[in-house]
């Protein structure tokens, strides 16, 4: 495979079989989560906000605090046309699309604001003020509660759900 850091936008074009990667030690997640599986990366970008291309993880599993969850496939495709960015995520557990002008780094705050509006007793408002974000999104879930539980034990009831909307902050 290829990992090229010689240009302003690094290029990643490789396939890997990861036996164990700790996302916390790689500075990809705050908590201690191990992942293993097969990965196929074909993208450019120096950070998550300028990621363009595709990343696929399959035959994988996550381990957090002794809890083990397997997943067969997760595919992320990111494209851009002018200022309009589109990200499509497909898996056995859910499908999601987000399209418009947005910063991936700001999405947690945006969705925290959105969820706080409808679930104020479960989700606190974000600490930081939102930047200008204009996008639409759709999410269709199948059996996702076990995965959500890994990241937020207070949220549940999202199996077999559909959520769509738009944000203009």
List where the protein language model places each region.
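Extended, charged low-complexity segments
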Residues: 125-129
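Hydrophobic lipid-interacting interfaces of membrane-associated proteins
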Residues: 1-10, 15-48, 53-109, 116-124, ...
């Amino acid at each position: 495979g290829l990992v090229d850091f010689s240009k302003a936008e690094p290029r990643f074009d490789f396939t890997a079989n990861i036996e164990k990667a700790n996302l916390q030690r790689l500075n990809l997640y705050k908590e201690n989560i191990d992942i293993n599986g097969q990965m196929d990366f074909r993208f450019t970008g120096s950070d998550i906000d300028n990621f363009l291309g595709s990343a696929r993880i399959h035959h994988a599993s996550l381990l957090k605090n002794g809890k083990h969850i397997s997943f067969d496939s997760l595919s992320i495709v990111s494209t851009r046309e002018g200022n309009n960015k589109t990200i499509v995520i497909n898996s056995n557990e859910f499908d999601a699309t987000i399209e418009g002008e947005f910063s991936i780094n700001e999405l947690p705050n945006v969705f925290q604001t959105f969820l706080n509006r409808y679930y104020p007793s479960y989700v606190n408002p974000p600490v930081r003020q939102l930047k200008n974000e204009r996008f639409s999104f759709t999410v269709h879930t199948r059996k996702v509660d076990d995965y959500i539980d890994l990241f937020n034990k207070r949220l549940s009831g999202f199996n077999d759900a559909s959520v769509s909307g738009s944000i203009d902050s």
